[in-house]
Regions:
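A conserved structural/catalytic subdomain of Rossmann-like adenosyl-cofactor enzymes
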Residues: 3-183
Length: 183
């Protein structure tokens, strides 16, 4: 189910109603914004009556630019009780955006990729992107941040800029004076 992200009632109200009204042990899948369960106070409350079993983070460009989504799979009527949540990230689905046509499998890659991901999700193993999430800490896939790196050249330039600022030296004026002396 892909409930409206924002509307009069809110997507988590719709999710909650579905989970309450299907038979116990029914598997329910919802496409939601990545952090929706964490940012909305209703998110953690859903876990009192249903188990969030899996989070499948979708590729960045599935919807419009800047909207990142995941598939959240619940088992209705069974409380979470602290059980860890399986999560993975389908970083590349092989689809490409075609102007005025959306995302298309123009290079025929999806079939192979789909089979691989179905196995990974079913077995809950086989990908470096797999995480086991504590629901008391997070309710979304946690992307690893790349370590901050800076080159010696960038560090030197930044330090020079800072020292010139600290000493009150006008960079433009300094550059002009230096150029005049050299020429």
């Amino acid at each position: 189910m892909n409930p409206p992200f924002e509307s009069k009632y809110g997507c988590l109200t719709i999710v909650g109603n579905v989970l309450k009204n299907v038979p116990e042990h029914t598997k329910c899948a919802f496409i939601l914004p990545d952090k929706k369960l964490e940012k909305d106070r209703k998110g953690p409350k859903l876990l009192k009556h249903s188990t969030l079993e899996k989070i499948i983070k979708l590729p960045e460009k599935v919807f419009s630019e800047g909207i990142t989504t995941s598939i959240f799979i619940f088992e209705a009527g069974v409380p979470q009780n602290g059980k860890e949540v399986f999560a993975c990230y389908i970083e590349n689905d092989g689809l490409e955006t075609v102007k005025n046509q959306g995302r298309q499998d123009i290079k025929d890659r999806w079939q192979a990729i789909e089979g691989e991901w179905i196995e990974i999700i079913r077995k809950q193993t086989g990908s470096d992107t797999i995480q086991w999430i504590e629901p008391s800490e997070h309710l979304s896939y946690q992307r690893h941040e790349k370590a901050f790196e800076i080159s010696d050249e960038d560090f030197t330039k930044t330090m020079m800029d800072y020292l010139m600022f600290k000493e009150g030296i006008d960079v433009k004026e300094f550059g002009e004076k230096l150029l005049t002396k050299v020429l």
